[in-house]
Amino acid sequence: MNGTDILRFLQSSPTISYSKHFILITACPLFVLGLLLLGLRTAMFKQVRGKTTTSRNRGVIAAKLLVAWYLATIVMYIAKSEMWKYAFAVSLLLNSLALFF
């Protein structure tokens, strides 16, 4: 073994750095998104439980969902994750479903 082989052995392999990069860019925003949705879900169901759902309640729920998804989308965009596009699309879908059904 010469010096180059030893240095190559001591350096981290590219798969490890790609794995860390993937975790930082994708998993962290998804974790934040999960926390946002978990907190929002419990708050929404506490608010609506025991009441009849009117269009105003659906509008409030849709607005809260939309804000949570937009916040998660911003977090994903800042983290340079490609999933922010999908989060934005899902936010629009959830908003339309909550308003029309």
From Swiss-Prot:
<feature type="transmembrane region" description="Helical">
    <location>
        <begin position="81"/>
        <end position="101"/>
    </location>
</feature>
<dbReference type="GO" id="GO:0016020">
    <property type="term" value="C:membrane"/>
</dbReference>
<dbReference type="Pfam" id="PF23480">
    <property type="entry name" value="YGL204C"/>
</dbReference>
<feature type="transmembrane region" description="Helical">
    <location>
        <begin position="20"/>
        <end position="40"/>
    </location>
</feature>
<protein>
    <recommendedName>
        <fullName>Uncharacterized protein YGL204C</fullName>
    </recommendedName>
</protein>
<keyword id="KW-0812">Transmembrane</keyword>
<dbReference type="GO" id="GO:0005783">
    <property type="term" value="C:endoplasmic reticulum"/>
</dbReference>
<keyword id="KW-0256">Endoplasmic reticulum</keyword>
<feature type="transmembrane region" description="Helical">
    <location>
        <begin position="59"/>
        <end position="79"/>
    </location>
</feature>
<keyword id="KW-1133">Transmembrane helix</keyword>
<keyword id="KW-0472">Membrane</keyword>
